[in-house]
């Protein structure tokens, strides 16, 4: 049994940790991310605040169930013109998002939180400016 838990069902995040020789197990937090995002946005939260809060909520929820373990929570959001672009629910939504972002700057905001005994012990948030340019959305249809 590992001493580290990734509070996520993301296979990519788990793979990144394992490739970097961080032995861990995965336990999804199953928080309602969409509801939390919408509630925070209604209250005027920035995309950075949303990313930070989701990472912390995920880590703390799993940490409360596993107090002796170190728990990593992470979240990423796309900020386009101060609006969060959510994960597409289907192929058409994905193509619409690609068209919307094509040729325009947007930001990837990623947050990581580490919790133990149900409380945050470390956190980090970073923001990268991205420019997506492609005709792929037209080619895929």
Q: Model-predicted segments: where are they?
A:
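Anionic-ligand binding region
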Residues: 111, 120
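Catalytic beta-strand/loop signature of glycosyltransferases that borders the donor
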Residues: 29-30, 122-124
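N-terminal polybasic phosphate/anion-binding patch
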Residues: 1-70, 83-84
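Active-site-adjacent loop/tail segments of enzyme domains
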Residues: 70, 76-106
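Single conserved hydrophobic/aromatic residue that forms the stacking wall/gate
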Residues: 132-141
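Short beta-strand and adjoining strand-loop segment in the mid-core
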Residues: 82-89, 113, 125-131
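A secondary-structure boundary/capping signal
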Residues: 73-74, 110, 126
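Residue-level signal for inorganic ion chemistry
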Residues: 17, 55, 75, 94, ...
């Amino acid at each position: 049994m590992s001493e580290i838990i990734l509070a996520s069902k993301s296979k990519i995040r788990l793979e990144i940790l394992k490739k970097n020789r961080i032995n861990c197990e995965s336990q999804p937090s199953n928080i309602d991310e969409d509801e939390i995002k919408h509630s925070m946005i209604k209250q005027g939260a920035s995309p950075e605040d949303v990313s930070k809060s989701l990472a912390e909520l995920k880590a703390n929820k799993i940490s409360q169930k596993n107090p002796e373990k170190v728990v990593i929570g992470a979240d990423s959001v796309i900020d386009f013109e101060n609006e969060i672009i959510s994960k597409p629910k289907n192929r058409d939504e994905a193509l619409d998002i690609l068209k919307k972002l094509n040729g325009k700057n947007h930001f990837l905001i990623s947050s990581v939180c580490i919790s133990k005994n149900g409380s945050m012990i470390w956190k980090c948030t970073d923001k990268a400016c991205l420019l997506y340019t492609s005709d792929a959305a037209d080619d895929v249809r």
